[in-house]
Regions:
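Conserved AAA+ ATPase small/helical "lid" subdomain
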Residues: 120-170
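AAA+ P-loop NTPase catalytic core and its hallmark functional loops
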Residues: 1-138
Length: 170
């Protein structure tokens, strides 16, 4: 399936609804929908709203109708398209805005945890440098050591280990 990656903090409210323009043929205003949203009625894409709770509150509010009603103004999301969103927890010390209750209520919330076996399977299939895999096998506790109460600006995560792998491979 096609994944349409939309980083909501980079969008404005008008980016969700689109831009109005005058339709001289019908003598009315219509909206030009965002090019990122699928228009093919047979589409089964996944619209991935990434960093949802890092988007400004006005952008989050503009997404209400798209998420709940699968439409924005005149634009209707094709029937086979799914909407998935992701964001950091407030406790992760990221740039986040509290998700408004009406928006939070439009989703099923699933909190993901780092799992060593899942990461090792992923790392093996994605050519993570053998030294990184070897170290993480030796020191499993170092795969993820983020402490939200801590003051360290650097910490180990699966993402940072993939960065180390890239550095070792270059």
């Amino acid at each position: 399936r096609e994944v349409i990656d939309i980083r909501l903090p980079l969008w404005e409210p008008t980016d969700i609804k689109g831009i109005p323009y005058y339709n001289s043929k019908d003598n009315n205003m219509v909206w030009a929908s965002p090019a990122e949203l699928p228009v093919d009625p047979k589409s089964n894409a996944i619209v991935f709203l990434d960093e949802l709770n890092s988007a400004a509150p006005a952008v989050q509010a503009a997404a209400y109708q798209l998420i709940l009603n699968r439409r924005v103004g005149q634009y209707v999301l094709p029937k086979g398209v799914s909407i998935v969103a992701a964001g950091n927890r407030d406790s992760d010390k990221g740039v986040t805005y509290r998700m408004p209750a009406p928006l939070a209520n439009r989703f099923v919330h699933v909190e993901l945890r780092v799992d060593y076996d899942d990461w090792m399977s992923w790392a093996t299939n994605h050519h993570i440098h053998p030294d990184v895999v070897g170290y993480c096998t030796f020191a499993k506790q170092d795969l993820y050591d983020f402490d939200p109460r801590g003051s360290s600006r650097s910490f180990a995560t699966p993402r940072s280990w993939s960065f180390v792998s890239q550095l070792l491979s270059d």
